[in-house]
UniProtKB/Swiss-Prot annotation:
<protein>
    <recommendedName>
        <fullName>CRAL-TRIO domain-containing protein F28H7.8</fullName>
    </recommendedName>
</protein>
<dbReference type="InterPro" id="IPR036273">
    <property type="entry name" value="CRAL/TRIO_N_dom_sf"/>
</dbReference>
<dbReference type="InterPro" id="IPR036865">
    <property type="entry name" value="CRAL-TRIO_dom_sf"/>
</dbReference>
<feature type="domain" description="CRAL-TRIO">
    <location>
        <begin position="81"/>
        <end position="257"/>
    </location>
</feature>
<dbReference type="Pfam" id="PF00650">
    <property type="entry name" value="CRAL_TRIO"/>
</dbReference>
<dbReference type="InterPro" id="IPR053302">
    <property type="entry name" value="CRAL-TRIO_domain"/>
</dbReference>
<dbReference type="InterPro" id="IPR001251">
    <property type="entry name" value="CRAL-TRIO_dom"/>
</dbReference>
Length: 410
């Protein structure tokens, strides 16, 4: 050790001091069930121990946890479900990598066998993302349990199996669209989970996929991605006990005990407009020029008003929700209610539900950041859940909004 190098004890003491500073500043919003040393440390690590930045981002995350009731029993969570995602694109949580004192959780994603085309025709953007959040909430519960038992920070080894992946013209669009966006949003909320992201059974065209995806991956994350070679079973057994791996990966656990089947999606699961949804013609069409944004303004009169936001977009667009007690304020003075959500174009109409905790003005910002040349159209209608009536934007008469058709009275 160099003469001026910090000892492990010094580093731990510095970590503990930083953790206490963060804990003190979020004490009014954090749920005791989430308040662990290791959860605090993960947020600090992901923000290079910048305490103000950590506190700012963690508070946003904690508000999101509260809004979706993620610290309550899982049955009370307000995350949406996706049967297609859960049953036909499952993530399998195997368990710790060691029989004793394991500090890495083994997770398997058999992405190569997923019916990608069928999945994209079956899911709504928000429910697809929420199903991923559900998986990562379970991973987080497992990590927290391991940390309570071992007394050390735990991570996961994420085995990304591309066996049977077929190249088709839509694959690049999915990789660069829904796949990339969903992982970016997962990364916003679940910090420092992955120790190694291990890609096995890579196809010959993996370089094409990597070229499309790599520009969007932070350098720190790239260092954790491992492209295993033809001897990947030996590589896995170097970091995971044989007793802790499924048989197909060189282990001893019968596959049927730990790996869910990955079957094609039947056409009966393809998305169809539910009877209680508005029709596509009823949604207002908002035109957003390339590299520009639009702002829709809504007035909410009562606290705890639940809004149902139905939307559809054919091209990538980013949506952000802001709040203000007053109407005429600059964007810089608005309070962030929901962090920016990139939304990819999918066939299904999306449903995003949001509880307006306070009365006042809510601003939906639509940003066409992905396009340099072409405008994008975003269709949207907002319904008050309790009354079932539309909440119209105050600026509905702007020339860049084409009003949707009124629903016919029955």
């Amino acid at each position: 050790m160099a003469p001026n190098a910090l000892s492990p004890v010094d580093i731990e003491n510095m970590n503990d001091a930083a953790i206490e500073q963060v804990r003190l500043q979020v004490s009014d919003v954090i749920d005791p069930r989430y308040d662990t040393k290791w959860n605090m440390l993960r947020w600090l690590q992901s923000n290079d121990f910048n305490i103000p930045k950590t506190v700012h981002l963690l508070k946003k995350h904690l508000k999101w946890r509260k809004d979706r009731k993620l610290d309550e029993p899982e049955s009370q969570s307000l995350l949406q479900f996706s049967d297609a995602r859960r049953k036909h694109a499952p993530i399998d949580i195997i368990g710790p990598q060691r029989k004793e004192d394991g500090d890495r959780l083994v997770v398997v994603d058999r992405a190569g066998r997923i019916d990608v085309s069928g999945l994209m025709k079956s899911v709504q953007p928000t429910e697809y993302l929420h199903e991923m959040f559900r998986s990562f909430e379970e991973i987080q519960r497992r990590l927290m349990k391991m940390e309570a038992e071992t007394g050390v920070q735990c991570y996961m080894h994420y085995i990304f199996d591309l066996e049977a992946l077929n190249f088709d013209p839509t694959l690049l669009g999915v990789v660069n669209g829904p796949f990339r966006v969903s992982w970016q949003l997962v990364g916003q909320h679940y910090r420092e989970f992955i120790d190694k992201f291990i890609v096995i059974n890579s196809p010959s065209y993996i370089n094409v996929l990597w070229s499309a995806l790599s520009p969007f991956i932070p350098e720190q994350s790239k260092q954790r991605i491992v492209f295993a070679g033809s001897n990947w079973k030996e590589e896995l057994l170097d970091i995971v006990d044989k007793e802790c791996l499924p048989e197909r990966y060189g282990g001893m656990i019968p596959d049927i005990q730990c790996l869910k089947p990955v079957d094609p999606i039947p056409k009966s699961l393809y998305w169809k407009l539910p009877a209680q949804y508005p029709t596509m013609d009823q949604l207002h069409k908002v035109s957003v020029s390339a590299s520009k944004h639009r702002m829709l303004i809504y007035k909410v009169d009562k606290p705890d008003t639940e809004l149902l936001m139905y939307s559809h977009n054919e091209n990538d667009i980013t949506i952000t929700l802001y709040y203000s007690k007053n109407k005429n304020v600059s964007e810089n003075d608005l309070e962030l209610a929901v962090a920016p959500i990139p939304k990819c174009g999918l066939p299904a109409m999306d449903l995003f539900d949001y509880n307006c905790e306070y009365p006042g003005y809510y601003y939906i910002k639509l940003a066409n950041e992905a396009s340099w040349l072409l405008p994008s159209t975003y269709r949207i209608i907002v319904i008050e859940k309790e009354s079932g009536k539309e909440l119209e934007p105050l600026n509905l008469n702007e020339k860049w909004i084409k009003k949707g058709q009124k629903s016919k009275k029955k």
